[in-house]
């Protein structure tokens, strides 16, 4: 059966922090790279002192590289905006960084964190990415999806803030194990169940999203825009 994934040649996944890309898109990344597609990941922030231990920031980046290697990511692009403090960064600076990475990679498909996530970094990254992806530029992604991030998307306020209502589902039945292995690389981030950042919670969400469309496991997205 044909899939919309067949139309993707080069994808860019924007992650506010290391591991967001695996939580939201790990199975889809693995499926795309198995098809021979080119997938890039841009991580927009870095933990800085005094809020974060610099050694911990280095460790989580090393974990991310290990996870990305497992998933077949073509290249990881690091930015050093302060984690949990993006609201202190000039919006124009974040816009410029996003425009630069989108222009340099020239993806046909963009995966973004959801604007309704409770973490302000996610909201700001979403907004800047949408600025960078405007179709008035010479190079722009023709399709944009928002992904869900356990521990962020699920803490919105329904009816008050934007609610994640997926309309695209990617069958990751054959890639759920790869996603779990990639998440397992983040030893500094994985927590025990019933935390949302546990292997059990991640698997439960994949099974629920899969059952929604009669699949064993799936990742859910919102299609934000497609230009044909």
Question: What name fits each language-model region?
Answer:
Residues 64-65, 81:
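A polyanion-binding, active-site-adjacent surface
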């Amino acid at each position: 059966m044909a899939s919309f994934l067949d139309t993707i040649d080069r994808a860019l996944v924007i992650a506010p922090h290391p591991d967001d890309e695996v939580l939201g898109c790990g199975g889809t990344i693995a499926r795309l790279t198995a098809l021979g597609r080119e997938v890039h990941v841009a991580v927009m922030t870095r933990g800085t002192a005094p809020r974060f231990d610099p050694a911990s920031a280095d460790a989580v980046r090393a974990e991310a590289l290990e996870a990305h290697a497992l998933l077949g990511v073509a290249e990881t692009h690091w930015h050093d905006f302060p984690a949990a403090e993006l609201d202190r960064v000039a919006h124009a600076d974040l816009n410029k960084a996003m425009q630069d990475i989108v222009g340099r990679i020239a993806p046909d498909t963009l995966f973004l964190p959801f604007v309704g996530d409770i973490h302000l970094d996610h909201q700001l990254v979403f907004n800047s990415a949408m600025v960078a992806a405007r179709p008035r530029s010479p190079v722009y992604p023709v399709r944009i999806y928002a992904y869900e991030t356990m521990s962020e998307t699920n803490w919105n306020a329904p009816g008050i803030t934007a609610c994640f209502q997926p309309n695209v589902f990617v069958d990751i039945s054959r890639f759920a194990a790869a996603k779990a292995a990639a998440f397992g690389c983040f030893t500094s981030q994985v927590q025990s169940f019933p935390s949302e950042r546990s292997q059990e919670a991640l698997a439960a969400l994949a099974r629920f999203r899969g059952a929604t469309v009669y699949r064993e496991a799936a990742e859910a997205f919102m299609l934000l825009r497609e230009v044909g």
